[in-house]
Amino acid sequence: MDLVRFFIFIIFVIVSIFIILLVLIQDEQGDGIGGVFGGGSSSIFGAKSSSVAVKITGFFIALFFIFVVLLSFLNTRRADDSFLNDIKTENKNSSTFWDDENSESDANINEIKENNLKEK
């Protein structure tokens, strides 16, 4: 599972670099990401078709978010498993403490009861 996590992380880094490069090579005529907030004459749902660079950038942004969710899911599962394993280990070590103590005290109680019955 660690190998899969490593490859997903490498692909995540490559996708991040591609997003940076694609945003840098886009022209500043309102077609890019900055054009959404101050695009001037272009509209969000305009009839003008978006360029290939904008479509590719959108695709890589979608991949970026998919890999973010995958990595967070994989890392969360790993942290939960290791935490639960630590708790199980602690419980195994501590279970003998009260078992031994109770068995000795039970034997002592039985001896006391037998002695009391003999005295009566």
Curated annotation (Swiss-Prot):
UniProt keyword annotations, A-Z: Cell membrane, Membrane, Protein transport, Translocation, Transmembrane, Transmembrane helix, Transport
Membrane topology classification: Multi-pass membrane protein
Record organism: Borreliella burgdorferi (strain ATCC 35210 / DSM 4680 / CIP 102532 / B31) (Borrelia burgdorferi)
An example molecular function term from Gene Ontology annotations: protein-transporting ATPase activity
Family: Belongs to the SecG family.
Any coiled-coil regions, as ranges: none
Name of the protein in question: Probable protein-export membrane protein SecG
NCBIfam families per the UniProt record, alphabetical: secG (TIGR00810)
Pfam families in the record: SecG
